[in-house]
Amino acid sequence: METLKSNKARLEYLINDMHRERNDNDVLVMPSSFEDLWELYRGLANVRPALPVSDEYLAVQDAMLSDLNRQHVTDLKDLKPIKGDNIFVWQGDITTLKIDAIVNAANSRFLGCMQANHDCIDNIIHTKAGVQVRLDCAEIIRQQGRNEGVGKAKITRGYNLSAKYIIHTVGPQIRRLPVSKMNQDLLAKCYLSCLKLADQHSLNHVAFCCISTGVFAFPQDEAAEIAVRTVESYLKETNSTLKVVFNVFTDKDLQLYKEAFNRDAE
C-alpha cells in the first residue's frame, strides 16, 4: 500500500529502487531540489529495460505521476475547431490532453526512447504515462516476434496520462532530400493506420503529434500537408465521426498547419 505523502518522497523512493536494481557500484547522491530529483528519476526510468516491477513500485509511481499530471490538464472541450466541428489544431504539450487517445511517434524497437532525459515525444509520453507502457510495448513486440514496421499502429492504455489510450506508430526516417514517394506514402500510412485503429476501438477522438518531423527529419511543411490531406480524406471517405486534433509544439508547425488548412479552403 502506497503511504508516502509527498511527490518528493515518492521520487526518492523510486530513484532508490531503480538504483538498487542496477546493482552497480556507483554512489547515489540524492539531489535536494524537486527539479533535480525529477531529472534523475526520469533518466533512470528512460534507460530501465522492460523488466517487471513490484506492486509497491507501481503504486508509488502511479500516485506520483497521476498527481503531477492532474496539475496540467487540457480538455478537448475547451479547444476551438479549425474546420467543421471535428478538426482542431492545438499548440501545447500533448501529454496534458484529456482525450480518448494521443499518438506517439515511436521507433522500430517500440520500447520508448531509451536515451536519458531526451526531449523527443516518445520519451516524454513514456515518462509521464509510466513504466507500464514500456512493458505493454515489449509484450507486443514479443508476441509479433519482430520490430515494429513503419506505417503500422498499435494501441496501449494511457495509464497515468489524462488520455485513455496511446496509439504508437513508427514514421519514416528521412536520410536524403527530396523526400521519396515511398516515404510520403509511408507517412500517410501512419496517419491512416492510427485513424483506423481509433475507429476499430470505437474511440471518439484522437490527437496526433507531428509524426517523423523530429529526429526522423521529415520536412515539416511536407509532413503537415500529408497529415491534413490524409486525415481529411479518411474522414470524408469513411464518414467517421472521429474528432481529430493536430497537436503542434513549435510556432513554425502551428503556422504550417494553419497555412495547410487555408490552402485547403481556397
From Swiss-Prot:
Species for this entry: Staphylococcus aureus (strain COL)
Coiled coil region boundaries: none
Cofactor(s), names only, from the UniProt record: Zn(2+)
A Pfam entry, by short name: Macro
Annotated ADP-D-ribose binding sites: D93, I94, N107, C120, I121, D122, S212, T213, G214, F216
Keywords: Glycosidase, Hydrolase, Metal-binding, Zinc
Binding site for Zn(2+): C113, H118, C120
NCBIfam families: PRK04143.1
EC number: 3.2.1.-
Superkingdom of origin: Bacteria
Entry similarity comment: Belongs to the MacroD-type family. Zn-Macro subfamily.
Name of this protein: Protein-ADP-ribose hydrolase
Catalysed reactions, as listed in the record: 4-O-(ADP-D-ribosyl)-L-aspartyl-[protein] + H2O = L-aspartyl-[protein] + ADP-D-ribose + H(+)
Recorded GO MF terms: hydrolase activity, acting on glycosyl bonds
Record's keyword annotation contains Cell inner membrane: no
Domain Macro, chain residue ranges per copy: 74-265
